[in-house]
Every structure is written in C-alpha cells, then in structure tokens.
C-alpha cells in the first residue's frame, strides 16, 4: 500500500482490499449509478470512539474491582468489553493519526507510517474477531446455565473460561495477522464472512431455544392461573422483544461491514457494488456503535455490576 494511501485509509490494509477496485475512488459526480453515500464526520467518528472507550473502561474496572464478579460469565463479559475497548482505541488512534498527517502536524517517514498502519490494522482486526467470539461465548454460557443448570459449575469453571479466553485472543491475533498479510486473497475475505454468519446462526439458534424453553416453563407455572393466556402472551412478547434486540443490534452493527467484504469478493468491479464501498467509514462507525451498545445489553443490566460501577465513579471523584 502506498504511503499516501496508508495516510488516508480509514482502516489501512483492510480498506486496501479495494485497491484493485478503481470504482471505489469515483467521486460522487462521476459516471455510474446514483449512489447514496452517507458521510461520517471525523469529529463524530472520534466522539463515538471516545464514548465507547470510556464506557468499556468502566465495565472492565468494575469487574476487576468486585471479586463477586470474578466468575466465568463476567470473565466473558469483561473480555467482550476489552475487545470493544480495543476496537474503539484502534479506530480513534488511526483517525487521529490520519488527521494529523493530513494537517501536516505529524511529520514521519513513509516507512514509519506503513509500519504503524499495519500494527493498527492487526489491532483492529483482532479486536473485531475476538468481539464476535466473545458474543458467541456469552450466548453459549447462558445456554449451558439454563439447560444444564445443575452441572453448570462443573462444566463452566473459571479455569476453563480463562483458557477459552486465552485461546480466543491467540486465534484472533493469528487470524488478523494472516488477514492483513493476505488481504488480497478472496478466500480470506470469504472465511471472515463465513465466520460472521456462523456466529449469527449460533446466537440465533441458542437464544431462540432459550426463549422457547422459557415460554414452556412459564406455561407450566401458570397452568392453574385464570389469566394463563395473558401471562403467557406477555412473557412471550417480552422474550421475543429481547431476542429481537439482541440479534437485531448484532446484525445491524456488524452486517453492513461483512456485506462490504462479501461484495469485495463477489463483485469488486460492479458499479452497484462500488456504491456500497463508498460507505465504508459508516460501516466502521456502526461497529463502534455496537461497542457502545454491548455494555448496555450484557453488562449494565447486572445490579451487582451497576452497584460496583457507582463505587468506581465515586472513588474516581
């Protein structure tokens, strides 16, 4: 990747998967289909990253402070927060470096820029892969806690959770390094897309099965009550809404980015696909939004964690 390209890319080597796609660089007024290009100001991009950064730092600090939260479930939640933290740090860092280079406030050689670009790319990709893995791990942990409740503490031990998280981090770093090294190979892009779809299917199946089991449990409890139908209907709607939020946020925030990768592999030269490529920075912003939403869904719903978070905030003041 040329030095100038590395200074301007929104995601370094990942964005340079499109180097072979001339249409990506088309201006909005050039020939081709009418494209909807959503501009994400650098200021907004940085603000989203900083909000996510602070939010996930608080989650990590709260879990580290409270020994009652040193359990397998919170181990996965903490690692998810760390992954989202790295997503935010890497994107904010790259955007800040890019702005400084464009403003001429940072004078470094092309070789240094290239090396920095590669390091940030590996950091971004590994944090994305690990974030997806820990979302799947949280779903599996909840599934085991429901369907194997009596054996849960013997199946999901803290040591096993720690080994699993170490394996996820190692696999994420290795896979992201290979991805950056072979970003121009179609099979690499397709592997990432298949991985995303596998995580989506895994989460959908596990959470749907948990919802079905919960509805059956409520049905058994309310069988003798007069307002059985209303209770079942209310619980079913609440469960369906929760499932929709979980999978909807996941698909909305991650789906466009992996659609982007799919189109690079399938139709890199097609004018319609080039319209999607123009919104690459928007897709990154959505991933950062996911890093903001994750603590709200998985961490802050815990009363114990919220209590510890208040203590952390009061202590910091």
UniProtKB/Swiss-Prot annotation:
Where in or outside the cell it occurs: the entry states: Cell membrane
Q: Name one GO molecular function term.
A: melanocyte-stimulating hormone receptor activity
The residue spans the entry assigns to the Extracellular side of the membrane are as follows 1-37, 94-118, 184-191, 267-279
According to the lineage, what is the superkingdom?
Answer: Eukaryota
GO CC annotation = plasma membrane
Query: What is the topology of this protein in the membrane according to its UniProt annotation?
Result: Multi-pass membrane protein
Query: Family assignment?
Result: Belongs to the G-protein coupled receptor 1 family.
Q: Write out the function statement from the record.
A: Receptor for MSH (alpha, beta and gamma) and ACTH. The activity of this receptor is mediated by G proteins which activate adenylate cyclase. Mediates melanogenesis, the production of eumelanin (black/brown) and phaeomelanin (red/yellow), via regulation of cAMP signaling in melanocytes.
- Tell me how this protein assembles: Interacts with MGRN1, but does not undergo MGRN1-mediated ubiquitination; this interaction competes with GNAS-binding and thus inhibits agonist-induced cAMP production. Interacts with OPN3; the interaction results in a decrease in MC1R-mediated cAMP signaling and ultimately a decrease in melanin production in melanocytes.
Q: What is this protein called?
A: Melanocyte-stimulating hormone receptor
**Native source organism of the sequence:** Galago senegalensis (Northern lesser bushbaby)
- Name of encoding gene: MC1R
